[in-house]
Structure formats: C-alpha cells, structure tokens
C-alpha cells in the first residue's frame, strides 16, 4: 500500500492540483510528513482535526473550504458530499483507504466515490471535470456479515429486546426498571437502539450498509466488481 501510494504521488508530481480523500487525520499527517509535502499542502477536516494537526505542528489546516487550494489538498469524510470544490484547473482525484491503520477509511463505490467526484462541477473544454480518479487500497477480511447472517442476528436481538422491554414496561419497581435498562444496553448492539431504548431502524439500515461496504474490501476483485456494478465509472483495475 505505502509503496503504491508513493508511486502515485510520483506520477502526479506535475499535476496542477491533486485532491486526496482520506478519512483519517492521523493518516493524512503521516503522509504529508513522509512525502515532505508540508509546504505544498492544505488539509480540510473537522475543527477537532484542525486542533490535533496544529498540536502536531501543521498549521495549514482548516475546517471549511477556502481558496486558493494548494498543489496537494487533503479532505476527510465531511467533505465527501454537499460541498462543491471550485477550481480553475482540472484536478487529479486520489481516494485512499488504509485498512491496516483505520477501517473507517473505507469508501462505498455506490455512494461516497460518486459523491467525491461530484464535488468537482466545473466542466472543461474536453467535457471532463477532472483528469483522473484513482482509488488505492489494501484489502483484508473485515469479518463482514452477509445480509442473511445480519438478518438472523437482528431477529435474535429483537426477540430478546421484546422480552426485556415488555418486562420493563410492566414493572413499577424502579430498581427492576434500571436493571432491565442496563440489560437492554448490554445485550443489544449500539446500532439497534436509540437514546429512548426504541428500535433504531435508521441505525439498522446503516449497519446493513456498513457490512455491505466491508464485504467489498475482502479482495481487489470484489471492490472492482462493486465499482463496475455502479455503472458510473469506467474502471481500470490493477493489483500490485
């Protein structure tokens, strides 16, 4: 992974503008330092991330888009959607996923990858909005559950939940209510319940999506197939 990333930055050394999407402030900071990009880069991330970077000695980090951009511009996930990036030059886009350091750097080809390229709306003379889009990732078994496995898991949780919540609602003893609440929180996964201990259907939908995306990163072939299945990208797949 690290060697491939270095090779890609070398390939893009003559690009006027490179926009790198990596959902890890720590990963971005390590990359900037290892490639000696401090004087040519800007980082766009959360306020908390800006604070961490300043503590680490990197001052060119902000929490909202402002211009001009640098040669190398790093964005965390809050900039994957909703924010337009306006440029006078056609950028090269680089998406990075490093599962060895942060599982949350995965990118969903069906949503986030499409949203990322959609941040660049200016169409140039060749009818394109960017020069290239490259996604570099390592792969591993993240223990993704199939939809059928997750169905069964959630069904079992719901049976347990229903039993406990009925006992909770029937009892008038405050100590019993407290005990049953604690049992609910211990037995059920976080995504299953909202703050009021009701079934969180939005959380359940997110869990299905999370497991779906994790399954793509079991191999390069599976991720390639997912990109192809979107019918949005013309994909060239290379394994190194």
Positions of predicted regions on the chain:
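Conserved helicase motor
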Residues: 23-26, 42-60, 76-78
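SF2 helicase motor core recognition
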Residues: 28, 65, 71-93, 115-126
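Flexible, charged surface loops at secondary-structure boundaries
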Residues: 8-16, 36-37, 61-70, 85-89
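Conserved SF2 helicase motif VI
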Residues: 100-129
């Amino acid at each position: 992974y690290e060697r491939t990333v270095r090779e890609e930055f070398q390939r893009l050394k003559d690009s006027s503008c490179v926009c790198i999407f990596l959902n890890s402030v720590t990963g971005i900071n390590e990359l900037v330092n290892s490639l000696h990009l401090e004087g040519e880069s800007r980082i766009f991330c959360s306020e908390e991330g800006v604070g961490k970077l300043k503590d680490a000695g990197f001052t060119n980090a902000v929490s909202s888009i402002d211009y001009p951009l640098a040669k190398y511009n790093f964005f965390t996930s809050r900039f994957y959607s909703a924010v337009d990036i306006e440029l006078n030059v056609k950028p090269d886009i680089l998406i990075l996923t490093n599962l060895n350091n942060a599982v949350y750097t995965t990118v969903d080809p069906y949503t986030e990858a499409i949203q990322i390229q959609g941040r660049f709306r200016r169409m140039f003379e060749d009818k394109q909005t960017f020069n290239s889009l490259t996604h570099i990732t390592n792969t591993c078994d993240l223990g993704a559950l199939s939809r059928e496995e997750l169905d069964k898991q959630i069904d079992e949780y719901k049976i347990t939940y229903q039993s406990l919540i009925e006992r909770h609602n029937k009892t008038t003893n405050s100590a019993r209510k407290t005990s049953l609440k604690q049992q609910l929180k211990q037995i059920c996964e976080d995504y299953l319940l909202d703050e009021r201990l009701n079934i969180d259907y939005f959380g359940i939908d997110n869990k299905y999506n999370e497991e779906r995306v994790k399954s793509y990163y079991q191999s390069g072939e599976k991720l390639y197939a997912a990109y192809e299945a979107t019918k949005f990208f013309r994909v060239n797949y290379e394994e190194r």
